[in-house]
Structure formats: structure tokens, C-alpha cells
Amino acid sequence: MRTIRVATIALGALVHVAGAQSIQYRSPSGVEYRSMADTGAVARARAALDADPRNVDRVIALGVAQSGVRQFREAIETFTRGIAIAPDNAMLYRWRGHRYLSVRELDRALADLSRGFALDSLNYGVLYHLGIVRFARGEFDAAADAFRRAQPRAPEVGELTGSTDWLWMSLSRAGRHAEAKAMLDRRPDSVKVANAYAQRLRLYRGEIGPDEVITAADTADVQKATLAFGVGNWYVVRGDTARARTYFEASIRSGGWPGFGFILSEVELRRLR
């Protein structure tokens, strides 16, 4: 009996290892993008949840830990488990919707984030990710509405910079250029922060040129994907789809496949066909 029990435990460990390297997304061209191995955070979060399996905070903690190593499909299963426990918890829909976005299941992402909005219309994470999904669907006015609602509810300056960036992009793509400029002129992101969105906002304001957005210091895959998409979108707004395509393709080459810039670059390249 002890031998069987040990073998079962070992098999469970192997399943977790295999899951840690599982295929998360296969692109239309057949490129497979995989998750990474757990470095301990997932195991600790799983153990904490096992000790209190109906604790929704621990469910979310496990899903967030899985997301940290790009185990997005596993995280979706975790959040689904949480929704079975607490079907009216807005944060579970916020997180599962985000992860559906990560694996390019946009309809499911929209359904979850819309449900999250119905439960808590003031939640920044719900609003922000709902805006991303609307943008991906080409619903730019609706995206602008979501980011406008999110902007004053940003929990910290980095998030404020992000929602300001996406609001400018959404307004611009909706053809509402005067509103986009007026919003930037109010400088809602006046507190300085060093992130990709801050670099992109400098481009939108004319403080730097498109060739200056991506620097030698930008080596992380998601960072490069984010910056390249921003420049590509800026060219779309200016009507230069040839240069836009170049930057969208660069975003894909970055390898930062979980990033919104990568996801939206895929979308934009399909639109440009």
C-alpha cells in the first residue's frame, strides 16, 4: 500500500511538472508557446489552498502564481474552481477573463469581464482588461469608455500610465483625435514612472521620435512587444500602415507572447491583410 501511495505522489509531481511546460497557445502559423516551470510559488500556493480549499483568496493566489510562470490554462482551471465556490465574486471573473485573453479566447474573455463589470463596475482590473478586449475586437469607442472609467481608479502610478496610454490609443483609433490630445494635455500621468507605457506616452506627446521609443535597455520580451506595438499603433493612427506592419512584426519577433502588445500585434496584422 505504501508503495502505491508513493507512486501516486510521484505521478502527481510528474503531472505538475508536465503541466508547467504545457502548451498554452498555438499561433495561426503553428508556433507553440509554452508555460514555464514552477520555481516554488505555485507549489506553495497550492499547498495553502489544499489546507483551506474553499478559501477564495487562496484560489486567487494560486491562479496568480500560475499566471506568473505563464501557466495560463492551469490558472483558468483554478479560477473556474473558485467561481464554483463563489459565483458572484467579481475578482474571479476579472482574473479568469484576463487569462482567457492571454490564451486568445476573446469571446470568453469578454463574457467574463462583462460579468465582472456587472458585479463591480468600479473595479480597476475589470475595467482595464475589458478595455483591452474591446480594443482587440475593434470596438474602439467601447474601449475608450472602459479606459476612461479605469483611469481615475488606477491603484498606483504605473497603472495610471497604462490606462492613460490605452485611453489615448482607443480615442485615436475611434477617430476622436481632439479628445485624445486634450486628455494628454491634462497630463493625468504627471507623476513620473519608468515603464513601457511612459515611453510610449512620450512618443504620443512628440517628446521623442518613433526610433527612440525602444532602447538598448529594453531587453525583456514583453517589454519589447509592448513598445513595438505602441509604435505600430501610432503609425496606424497616422495612416502609415506599411511602417505599422514593420513594428507589429517586430512585436511578434520579441517572443513576449503573453503581453498585450504581442496579442494586439497579432490582431493588427490580421486586420492589415
Predicted stretch roles:
Residues 20-57, 61, 68-69, 273:
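N-terminal leader/linker segments that initiate helical-solenoid repeat arrays
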Residues 68-69, 102-103, 136-137, 173, ...:
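Register position in tetratricopeptide repeats
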